[in-house]
């Protein structure tokens, strides 16, 4: 399965909606990794699915997609979308998230400490 086919097949799905619900919970000034979001959405080992779900968002989406970064504490490059990478860094900086000279942020300092929500 190609990335494009995987992305198209998840649009609007239950998994996609669960991912977006988790991303909406990430507080201002904090970041979460793709893998962390996947686990919290009940989709362990599905970090790529998180990336596909975020990539499918419209540019005017209220979902704080910019708060999701890779496990190395970096903004993941997007093929053909260098402006999105810059936008992500600018939005995070505006929230107080700092990056070092190599483009890495401290997950220890800025990482979101969340737990899965319990069902009622």
What kind of region is each of these model predictions?
Residues 2-120:
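Nucleic acid-binding interface residues in structured DNA/RNA-binding domains
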């Amino acid at each position: 399965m190609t990335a494009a086919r995987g992305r198209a097949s998840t649009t609007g799905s239950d998994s996609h909606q669960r991912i977006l619900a988790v991303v909406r919970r990430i507080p201002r000034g904090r970041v979460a990794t793709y893998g962390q979001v996947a686990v919290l959405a009940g989709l362990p080992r599905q970090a790529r699915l998180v990336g596909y779900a975020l990539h499918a968002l419209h540019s005017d989406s209220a979902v704080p997609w910019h708060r999701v970064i890779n496990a190395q504490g970096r903004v993941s490059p997007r093929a053909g979308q260098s402006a999105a990478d810059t936008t992500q860094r600018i939005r995070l900086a505006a929230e107080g998230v700092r990056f070092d000279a190599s483009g890495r942020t401290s997950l220890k300092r800025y990482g979101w400490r969340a737990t899965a929500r319990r069902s009622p």
